[in-house]
Curated annotation (Swiss-Prot):
<feature type="region of interest" description="Disordered">
    <location>
        <begin position="1098"/>
        <end position="1121"/>
    </location>
</feature>
<dbReference type="Pfam" id="PF00493">
    <property type="entry name" value="MCM"/>
</dbReference>
<dbReference type="GO" id="GO:0005634">
    <property type="term" value="C:nucleus"/>
</dbReference>
<keyword id="KW-0539">Nucleus</keyword>
<feature type="binding site">
    <location>
        <begin position="354"/>
        <end position="361"/>
    </location>
    <ligand>
        <name>ATP</name>
    </ligand>
</feature>
<feature type="region of interest" description="Disordered">
    <location>
        <begin position="1053"/>
        <end position="1080"/>
    </location>
</feature>
<feature type="compositionally biased region" description="Polar residues">
    <location>
        <begin position="691"/>
        <end position="710"/>
    </location>
</feature>
<protein>
    <recommendedName>
        <fullName>DNA helicase MCM9</fullName>
        <ecNumber>3.6.4.12</ecNumber>
    </recommendedName>
</protein>
<keyword id="KW-0238">DNA-binding</keyword>
<dbReference type="InterPro" id="IPR027417">
    <property type="entry name" value="P-loop_NTPase"/>
</dbReference>
<feature type="compositionally biased region" description="Basic and acidic residues">
    <location>
        <begin position="1065"/>
        <end position="1075"/>
    </location>
</feature>
<feature type="region of interest" description="Disordered">
    <location>
        <begin position="926"/>
        <end position="1009"/>
    </location>
</feature>
<dbReference type="GO" id="GO:0006974">
    <property type="term" value="P:DNA damage response"/>
</dbReference>
<keyword id="KW-0378">Hydrolase</keyword>
<dbReference type="GO" id="GO:0004386">
    <property type="term" value="F:helicase activity"/>
</dbReference>
<dbReference type="GO" id="GO:0000724">
    <property type="term" value="P:double-strand break repair via homologous recombination"/>
</dbReference>
<dbReference type="InterPro" id="IPR001208">
    <property type="entry name" value="MCM_dom"/>
</dbReference>
Length: 1169
């Protein structure tokens, strides 16, 4: 059926008025163009046109092939009208080749298709979406010819028949209306066609989009015919939407030959969708939803990230590290062009290497589902042509057909069984992975195609994976190919009973009653989120730059580096992954957090290992507390990269975040006692959880392992902290960093507050502690018997402090935070102290000393004593209010104030146990003291003391800053024979769990040449590493101690000498002795007299010297710097000290690379006797 003349004129007039109303500017722009012979399109929105006149819409849907030429004619008339109405100008010239291009059809099944049209669609105008898989060469098409009748000389024009492949069918008789009826015609064009009767012509083949098909469906293809300006508008691999009329065509008929009809789409307009996200609409509402999600996780963004990771491939249990890596690869980096014009790829590539059954293919399948433009192929049977591009012969000519990588341009290409690709085919993807193009020279066709795709590959090792060999040997892939992967994760299916049990229960639970978690994101939401974050363009910050560059340099210098992997590509990989992680976290700046996370992931992959060594990615599960894990990664990585300033800033930021979270969770009116009780409870619970013993395969995180038996004293020395952070948070670490932050004003006021709060802290502890109330004696005994395991050389596993001691340390560190309550409780403090003093005096003196030494009540700094005796010796302070101090003899010199224990000086002795105090003073305490105490005491003795500077630097930096003033020198005014003192067995024990945050030094006054003496207290293991001496060394040590004493005639009763902890049996014996009472020894009065004769004498020739810089040697577990050696003749005998050789090359052992804890106090315990 054809349109009538009135209908044709109506359509023409309506369309012309529509163009003049809506597209006048477009037409003017076309008229200004210089090339008169080119073809120019005017894009018309179908919805707007149909709204203007519904009748036109009906005609258009019914007779598209007839209406489209009418539109073109109306467009030419409209252009002429615009030209005449416009101001005359030489620029404006009429263009004959104008085409109306219809787009924006209403989205309804009749007009919009995602599948290839069928026969019933013939003659309809449709939009079809698909992927270009083949493009033919551009040809010249002669679409009309002029003929002349030989008889009547009538000239007429014959059109090429589209349905017969543009063949010309001459009429059977002359078309002259006068009735010539001649059958003889001559073609006027002769051998050459005039340009006006020819046009450009190209055929392309589109294929249904794979991701829109059901599983098992083979995508179908369709030929699309492009003419005029549509030619070369797309290329192989493009996602396009074609608007056009479905038509059928056939070859010319031949006798006895079957007529094959072919459906083709005659295109009216082609829209390339590469930049658009297929199937995902992102509006403000969707964006707002994700912004609210991240606002909710503002104080703990890593928890939000882990929620997204848990939704990634939820059918696979655990594999936290792999999920993080896949998420970063899917997010992708930022593609950029440098100053020289070189394009640097933004897409990352990931290779999963693993034993069968480790879930590799599951990740590939899931990634294909949530990525808009993706191709999944198996390496088995894939040829280089199948992956890149192939030349095929069609209709007597060669064409290029796109392979998997080209089809995945701008998306994701997943290749399973990667090692099954033949060697010569595998090299064909080198260019596709790095330059992201494919250069082809096949069958006379030379071209270059884009392959801007992310490659996610999975492969099995050949045979069993051998950790001793390199990756390239295990999976038989060459170094050039391996170096192009940003991450290579190894999943080793090792025998792990705990892991197998968890996995089997997870699978069986899903089989029995499959349930959908409320918190997991749906696949649609994941797809939308990954499409949204690809629009973010993160910029690198200075901190992240510094970390990535430092890590790259360390990798290059590493002994175990893989030369094929640690090329400049490693640095580019780090940058891409950091940008990807910033995108994943919905940020437009790459922060230090992103850089640290990327370094930790890279360390866990086969490219890493410079910091942590190779790690198995299989047995990793989600951390209970992501911030704790991240904090530990920060300390580990930044310490190892020697970026202490960045570490300090980041820890401050984390503390601030944690404080904000805490304030939100708990009302501000919470009392100090409640906080203390809560902290104590946490610490006790963490004690009971005990240290977990991680398996070799555990990495960035793992399940909490079963507790170790209490009697087991052998620590796991493997560096596992990054892989297996303990679930319990190290509260004291946070408190100390917060304390450092609060104390950066340079004054010592905070120390006063700390001391004033100690009694209050202790009092609150007794009120709120979940432990039964025990006398100090029993407590000391219990602590010794319980904690034989806790202070071994196990510096690699984060240590859990003894329950009570840890909680008390927490209380102490929290104390300065509660400054507002000092005045209320200061009076209670004095009464409490008196009460404890009398309680201590009831027991016999040595028992009291045992109680002091092993007590775990709280930190008791006798500031009143300090003030009193400082005043008497140097008249620096005015007066004190503590009545107990007046009872002590006034002969106590300044040095007597110095060695105050930071942990357990709980019982203040008075004159009744002065004998015990004198003995203890004789053997000067080597306990750790907090930095605050050292500074307070330094102030007290003014210029006679070392100078300490307190800043905001991290502990290690503080350690390196303090210096000595060159004025003090200790001298012994008494005879040498009197300088020998016995060491009581009850006084040479160190508290097993006692390792506070650690870099505080014992800054006592001492001769400069002895100032470097350090004592490394590492429990029994520490003892084994020290040289074993004979019993005769005891007297030598005692003499040395006597010389060093230099005037410390009397120290109040809580100063003791702490040495390495004895074995548990010895501790038990000591505890019995303490309880026994009468079996202990008293000091004779002559010794006290000799002690009281020591005095100070300063030498002008003394030189100040700073302590040695402390370095970490992760491979060397020995303590190199102590000049004070411990000699053990028999493990059940008391320990004695001898001065070692000062010139010995030495390094103080710090925490292991994998330890969560700060620097261990014991290893940095400088003793200045």
């Amino acid at each position: 059926m054809a349109l009538r003349a009135d209908q044709v004129s109506l359509i023409g007039q309506v369309f012309e008025s529509y163009l003049l109303q809506h597209h006048r500017d477009d037409i003017l722009g076309i008229l200004r163009q210089g090339d008169d012979e080119a073809h120019y399109p005017v894009l018309v929105d179908a919805l707007t046109l149909f709204e203007t006149n519904m009748e036109i819409g009906e005609y258009f849907n019914a007779f598209p092939s007839q209406v489209l030429p009418i539109f073109d004619g109306a467009l030419r008339r409209a252009a002429m009208a615009v030209l005449q109405a416009a101001t005359p100008s030489p620029e404006l010239r009429m263009k004959p080749n104008l085409h109306a291009r219809i787009s924006g059809l209403p989205i309804c099944p009749e007009l919009t298709r995602e599948h290839i049209p069928k026969t019933r669609d013939v003659g309809h105008f449709l939009s079809v979406t698909g992927t270009v898989i083949r493009t033919s060469l551009v040809k010249v098409l002669e679409f009309e010819r002029s003929y002349i009748c030989n008889k009547c000389k009538h000239v007429f024009v014959a059109k090429a028949d589209f349905e017969q492949y543009y063949a010309f069918c001459r009429p059977s008789a002359c078309l002259n209306e006068e009735g010539c009826n001649s059958t003889k015609f001559t073609c006027l064009s002769g051998t050459s066609s005039s340009p006006s009767s020819c046009r450009d012509y190209q055929e392309i083949k589109i294929q249904e989009q794979v991701q829109r098909l059901s599983v098992g469906s083979i995508p179908r293809c369709m030929v699309v015919v492009l003419e005029d300006d549509l030619v070369d508008s797309c290329k192989s691999g493009d996602d396009i939407t074609v608007y056009g009329v479905v038509m059928q065509r056939w070859k010319p008929f031949h006798q006895d030959a079957r007529c094959d009809l072919e459906l083709v789409l005659k295109a009216n307009y082609v829209k390339v969708n590469n930049e658009q996200l297929a199937g995902v609409t992102i509006d403000e509402e969707v964006r707002k939803e994700f912004e609210d999600f991240w606002e909710k996780h503002r104080n703990n963004p890593l928890a939000g990230r882990n929620e997204i990771l848990a939704s990634l491939c939820p059918q696979v249990f655990g594999l936290y590290l792999v999920k993080l890596a896949v998420a970063m690869v899917l997010a992708g980096g930022v593609q950029r062009i440098d100053a020289t014009g070189t394009r640097i790829r933004g897409e990352s590539h990931l290779l999963l290497v693993g034993d069968p059954g480790t879930g590799k293919s599951q990740f590939l399948k899931y990634a294909v589902k949530i990525t808009p433009r993706s191709v999944l192929t198996a390496g088995i049977g894939s040829t280089s042509a199948g992956l890149t591009v192939t030349a095929v012969k069609d209709f007597g000519e060669w064409n290029l057909e796109a392979g998997a990588l080209v089809l995945a341009d701008g998306g994701l290409c997943c290749i399973d069984e990667f090692n099954s690709i033949k060697e010569h085919d595998r090299t064909s993807i080198h260019e596709a992975m790095e330059q992201q193009t494919i250069s082809v020279a096949k069958a006379g066709l030379v071209c270059k195609l884009n392959t801007r795709t992310t490659i996610l590959a999975a492969t099995n090792p050949k045979g069993h994976y051998d950790p001793a060999e390199s990756v390239s040997v295990n999976i038989a892939l060459g170094s050039p190919l391996l170096s192009r992967f940003d991450l290579v994760l190894v999943l080793l299916d090792t025998k792990n009973e705990e892991w197998d049990r968890i996995i089997s229960s997870f699978i069986l639970q899903n089989k029995g009653c499959p349930s959908k978690s409320e918190k997991l994101w749906s696949m649609e939401k994941m797809k939308t989120y990954f499409c949204l974050i690809k629009r973010i363009q993160p910029k690198l910050s200075d901190e992240s730059n510094l970390i990535l560059v430092r890590y790259y340099q360390m990798q290059r210098q590493s002994d175990c580096r893989n030369a094929a992997r640690t090329t400049i590509r490693l640095l580019e990989s780090l940058i891409r992954l950091a940008e990807a992680h910033a995108r994943l976290m919905f940020r437009d700046t790459v922060t230090l957090e992103d850089a640290v996370t990327v370094v930790s992931v890279m360390e866990s992959s086969m490219q890493g290992g410079a910091l942590l060594g190779a790690i198995n990615a299989l047995h990793t599960s989600f951390p209970e507390n992501p911030m704790t894990q991240y904090r530990m990664q920060c300390e580990l990585i930044l310490e190892r990269l020697e970026l202490h300033d960045l570490l300090h800033k980041e820890l401050q930021r984390l503390d601030r975040l944690q404080k904000e979270t805490y304030c939100q969770l708990q009302p501000e009116e919470t009392s100090f006692s409640t906080i203390t009780g809560c902290l104590n409870k946490n610490t006790f619970e963490s004690k009971q959880k005990s240290q977990s013993e991680p398996s070799d395969q555990q990495k960035i995180n793992s399940y909490p392992q079963p507790s170790l038996p209490k009697s087991n004293c052998e620590g796991d020395k493997h560096p596992e902290a990054l892989r297996n952070p303990t679930p319990g948070n190290n509260i004291s670490t946070k408190r100390l960093s917060r304390l450092n932050k609060r104390s950066d004003d340079g004054s010592l006021g905070w120390f006063d507050r700390l001391e004033d709060r100690n009694t209050d802290a202790e009092e609150t502890f007794w009120k709120t502690s979940p432990l039964p109330k025990t006398s100090p004696d029993n407590m000391a005994l219990k602590t010794m018997s319980k904690s034989s395991c806790s202070e071994e050389g196990n510096s690699s596993v984060p240590r859990k402090e003894d329950g009570m001691r840890g909680s008390l340390r927490t209380v102490t560190l929290c104390a300065p935070l509660e400054q507002d309550k000092v005045s209320e409780i200061s009076s209670k403090r004095t009464e409490e102290r008196k009460c404890f003093s009398s309680e201590a005096n009831i027991q016999d003196p040595t028992s009291a000393s045992a109680s002091v030494q092993e007590s775990v009540i709280t930190q008791r700094v006798s500031k009143s004593l300090q003030r009193l005796h400082t005043e008497k010796s140097h008249r620096f302070f005015t007066s004190t209010q503590n009545s107990e101090a007046n009872a002590l003899p006034s002969v106590l010199p300044v040095s007597g104030l110095l060695d105050l224990s930071s942990d357990t000086d709980s019982v203040v002795g008075d004159e009744n146990n002065s004998a015990s105090a004198a003995v203890k003073h004789a053997v000067i305490s080597m306990r750790k003291r907090s930095k605050g105490q050292a500074e307070k005491e330094a102030k007290a003795v003014s210029s006679h003391e070392p100078e300490i500077t307190d800043g905001e630097s991290p502990p290690a930096a503080k350690l390196a800053k303090f210096s000595f003033r060159p004025r003090t020198k200790l001298d012994d005014s008494s005879e040498k024979k009197n300088a020998e003192f016995p060491l009581f067995p009850s006084e040479n024990t160190v508290k097993p769990g006692e390792q506070p945050q650690g870099e505080q030094l014992q800054k006592d006054c001492c001769p400069p040449e002895k100032r470097k003496m350090t004592l490394t207290c590492l429990g029994r293991k520490g003892l084994e590493k020290q040289s074993i001496g004979s019993k005769g060394n005891e007297e030598q040590l005692s003499q040395a101690l006597g010389k060093e004493m230099g005037g410390n005639a009397l120290i109040h009763s809580d100063v003791t000498l702490d040495v390495v902890s004895p074995p548990p049996t010895e501790k038990r014996r000591e505890g019995e002795e303490k309880l026994g009472g009468p079996s202990t020894v008293r000091v004779c009065s002559s010794t006290l007299e000799n002690l009281s004769k020591f005095c100070f004498a300063s030498r002008p020739d003394s030189k100040s010297e700073a302590p040695p810089t402390i370095k970490t040697d992760t491979n060397n577990k020995e303590s190199h710097s102590p000049l004070l050696k411990v000699h053990v003749s028999n493990p059940n005998k008391r320990k004695s000290f001898a001065l070692g050789n000062a010139s010995k090359d030495s390094v103080v052992t710090r925490k292991s690379l994998f330890s969560i804890a700060e620097l261990d106090d014991a290893t940095l315990d400088f003793d200045w006797d």
